[in-house]
Amino acid sequence: MNELDILQLFYDEMKNRSATRDQVFLNMEEEAAAMLSQKLGQSVSVADLQKLTDICIANEWLERTTADPNYKYLSLTEAGLQVILANQYS
C-alpha cells in the first residue's frame, strides 16, 4: 500500500458519484481502512492509513476542509488529482 492507494479512494468516489474533486469529502478512519483492505486483499490498519494520509497532506495532495485536526472531511486537491491521473494514464 502507498500514497497512490489513498488518492485512488478519492478518485474512485468521484467517479462513483459523477462528482468533481471539490464535491467529495472522505474520512480516513475505520471505514476507509476496511475499504482499502477489501480492495487490496490485505489487512490495512487505521494507523497505516493515517500515516500515508499525513504524507498526502504534507505533499498537498489532500487537504483538510474543516478546523478538525483529525482525519475527517478530507478533500483531494488539484495537485492530488493530477498525481492520480498521471499515474493512471502513463
Regions found by a protein language model. Give the residues of each.
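Short, surface-exposed loop/turn segments at secondary-structure junctions
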Residues: 22, 67-70
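Short helix-coil junctions and helix-kink-helix linkers
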Residues: 27-46
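Charge-rich, solvent-exposed alpha-helical interaction surfaces
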Residues: 6-9, 13, 35, 39, ...
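Short, amphipathic alpha-helical interaction segments positioned at domain boundaries
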Residues: 72, 78-90
